[in-house]
Amino acid sequence: GHTFVSYVSSIQAQLVQLDSLIRRDFVQHEFSLSVASSGYYFLSRICAELFERYRSIGIRIEQFEDHENNVADLVDSQAAEIGIVRVWSCYKNAYLKQLRARKLQHFDIASLSIAVTVGEQNPLYHRESDFVSAAELRELPPVMYSNMDSGPYADIYDRLHLSNKGSRFVVSSRSALYEILSNTSCYYLNSAYPFDVLDTGLPSNYANYRTLKLANCDITSEIIWFKREDYIMSQLSNEVINSVTRYFA
């Protein structure tokens, strides 16, 4: 009996996998888009606008959110058509080398100043200047994604002279990160995105946060996108990239 159950379970697993492949093949023939990123406000807004534009004729948009290395995995495995990530300039060459090794073709989008985002509970929120020094930040706790707490990018705080051996808050989602910013004195190491561009005439999702540029910083925040070398861009993927490029223009 145990042998029979094991045999049937194996067959069932194969049938489920086959069904998944069939459905995936069907989805590829729909008006669809799959995009992976590290979780960006501008990308969610752009995809939402795209969805509203085409929803009357039927559209499927799938957004993946993960850290930089896993975004590359998603594109390489064809789970996502395109990937959009931020890479600190000090790590960029090594990251691009990894992309090339996986036959992923990259394109530069923008080079931004490094900044920090704070909520109303942070003493920096009410300052007059739009800049903050590393020395000031060393007195405050950071909130960060788990891949910034350990791993190949964890020394960015040392490189920026922000090392704080005290408390820190580690999260795995964007929603949790901004909840922490709202309720603590933590700061988030960010990029100087042009937040106001997408918020013109619309309620701002960032009205209760403030982003300050890091003074005297020679490291930059590089925004890039990539795809598989053999992937032919679809109408929707082209529209997304064109919109992202215009956002940073």
PLM features: residue spans?
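Alpha-helical "hinge/linker" immediately C-terminal to small N-terminal DNA-binding modules
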Residues: 1-24
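Immediate post-signal peptide segment of exported/extracytoplasmic ligand-binding proteins
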Residues: 19, 23-33, 136-139
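Central regulatory/effector-binding core of bacterial HTH transcription factors
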Residues: 30-95
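Secondary-structure junction motif
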Residues: 44-46, 92, 126-163, 233-237, ...
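Short beta-strand-to-loop elements that line the ligand-binding cleft
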Residues: 58-67, 144, 163-176
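Alpha-to-beta junction loops
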Residues: 75-88, 114, 181-191
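Beta-alpha-beta core module
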Residues: 99-107, 112, 175-232
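Flexible hinge/capping segments at coil-to-helix
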Residues: 99-142
